Swiss-Prot record:
Name of the featured protein: Acyl-[acyl-carrier-protein]--UDP-N-acetylglucosamine O-acyltransferase
Entry-linked InterPro entries: Acetyltransf_C (IPR029098), Acetyltransf_C_sf (IPR037157), Hexapep (IPR001451), Hexapep_transf_CS (IPR018357), Lipid_A_LpxA (IPR010137), Trimer_LpxA-like_sf (IPR011004)
SUPFAM superfamilies per the UniProt record, alphabetical: Trimeric LpxA-like enzymes
Swiss-Prot/TrEMBL catalytic activity: a (3R)-hydroxyacyl-[ACP] + UDP-N-acetyl-alpha-D-glucosamine = a UDP-3-O-[(3R)-3-hydroxyacyl]-N-acetyl-alpha-D-glucosamine + holo-[ACP]
A single Gene Ontology CC term: cytoplasm
Pathway the protein acts in: Glycolipid biosynthesis; lipid IV(A) biosynthesis; lipid IV(A) from (3R)-3-hydroxytetradecanoyl-[acyl-carrier-protein] and UDP-N-acetyl-alpha-D-glucosamine: step 1/6
Native source species: Haemophilus influenzae (strain PittEE)
Protein purpose: Involved in the biosynthesis of lipid A, a phosphorylated glycolipid that anchors the lipopolysaccharide to the outer membrane of the cell.
Principal subcellular localization: cytoplasm
Length: 262
């Protein structure tokens, strides 16, 4: 079903069964196959391919030669029914690839709202990207990676499968990330190591000085106290009871399975 207000270039191919919403623009030589739904005001510039059981939300800009919902590269995948879901107001630049999920994972590759994926970014099967993230040119996420809100991934960086990157993390360019990265941390290198708190990012997002001071103290407890994470976690949990910003640490450590970068 194609909404009457949608604008579709004559060279675009739209398979029967696709749902194209109000004021959607689909440019030259785009291909939309399968049970795809594209919601209101989303723009496919040109040469964009969208396949499979894919939902793209409202007000997205998707640039040329991007591929969304394609069969993933997991050798165990045998064509099972899995999904790709993209939220609202994302910018997805040229040559980005976003693959559908697997039944061995959560079955869904999901991207939230207000994210920027720059040129040549790869998002593998079952990745979960939340909101307001920036992935710079040639950043690569392996399968099952999770990015929490406001993560910045520098250009040419690679993140190992199943890694969790906490909220407000900044990863420097060319990083190889093979373990989980706690919230608010700056990290860089091969393999990535922590080198402080992302204070500039927190200032830009309106964090006050007492909150940033509390976050720095938690960072010091984790990385400079000489104690193990198991030893400092009870104290962090106690602080988190009265400080919502610190609760991000507690929630993160409950999810973390790969150990944290050191």
């Amino acid at each position: 079903m194609i909404h009457p207000s949608a604008k579709i270039h004559p060279t675009a191919l739209i398979e029967e069964g696709a749902v194209i919403g109000e004021d959607v623009f689909i440019g030259p030589f785009c291909i939309v196959e399968g049970t795809v739904e594209i919601k209101a005001r989303t723009v496919l510039k040109s040469h964009v391919v969208v396949r499979g059981d894919t939902v793209i939300g409202e007000d997205n800009e998707i640039y040329q030669f991007t591929s969304i919902g394609e069969v993933n590269q997991d050798l165990k995948y045998k064509g099972e029914a899995t999904k790709t879901i993209i939220g609202n107001s994302n910018k997805i630049r040229e040559h980005v690839t976003i693959h559908r999920g697997t039944i061995q994972g959560c079955g869904v590759t999901a991207i939230g709202n207000n994210n920027l994926l720059m040129i040549n970014v790869h998002v593998a099967h079952d990745c979960q990207i939340k909101n307001n993230c920036i992935l710079a040119n040639n950043a690569t996420l392996a399968g099952h990676v999770e990015l929490d809100d406001f993560v910045i991934v520098g250009g040419m960086s690679a993140i190992h499968q199943f890694v969790i990157v906490g909220a407000h993390v900044m990863l420097g360019g060319g990083s190889m990330v093979s373990q989980d990265v706690p919230p608010y941390v700056m990290a860089q290198g091969n393999h990535a190591r922590p080198f402080g708190v992302n204070l500039e990012g927190l200032k830009r997002r309106g964090f006050d000085k007492p909150t940033m001071h509390a976050i720095r103290n938690i960072y010091k407890m984790i990385y400079r106290s000489g104690k193990t994470l198991e030893e400092v976690l009870p104290e962090i949990e106690q602080i988190a009871e009265t400080d919502s910003a610190i609760s991000f640490f507690v929630e993160f450590f409950k999810r973390s399975t790969r150990g944290i970068i050191r």
